Amino acid sequence: MKGDKMPKIQLCVGDLPAKVKFSKSVAVDTETMGLNLKRDRLCLVQLSDEKGNVYLVQIKKGKNCPNLKALLTNPKIIKIFHFARFDVAKIKEDLGLVVSPIYCTKIASKLCRTSSPSHSLKSLCWDLLGVELCKEQQTSDWGAEVLRGYYTMIIGFSQPMRLRY
């Protein structure tokens, strides 16, 4: 994030607002009720732009999310994930679309940092950005109407990490 200033965080219920635009890339992370692709529903899609602004899109049951879907399938915008495999599979399962193009910081780390013992997001943030991640404040009830104590800073680090590779 530029200048160490706090990002603007916007909660978007049901879909990403049509007025929100991304230029070249968007950092993406998903939160679910669990890790079973078939059983556990997608609750939240976090997006961060190149300026560090964060959009928390709460996914409501039965909602179509046309703006979010358009963003995730836009071939001109790179979607940055850390360990994209689960997120991409869950988006396909719940929203019925294939996310493309994708940049995975975990795969990039494995390719570029072959001697590193860890490729976790926490390790990457510390090694590349000098930032220590603390997920203690992260909520686990992603299906709640009101998200409490959510630590949104994590998603903001994917954009600058991509620039390091």
Task: Go through each PLM region and give its residues.
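N-terminal accessory regions of nucleic-acid-interacting proteins
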Residues: M1-V26, T30
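Active-site-proximal helix-loop-helix substrate-binding element of RNase H-like nuclease domains
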Residues: G3, Q46-L47, G52-Y165
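Short amphipathic alpha-helical surface micro-motifs
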Residues: I9-L11, S25-D29, D40, K61-K63, ...
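A generic structural signal for short beta-strands and their flanking turns/coil linkers
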Residues: K24, R41-C43, N53
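Non-catalytic, usually N-terminal nucleic-acid engagement modules in DNA/RNA processing proteins
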Residues: A27, N36, L44-S48
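Conserved Rossmann-like nucleotide-cofactor binding loop
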Residues: M33
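Short, glycine/acidic-enriched capping/hinge loops at junctions between secondary-structure elements
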Residues: L37-R41, L56-Q58
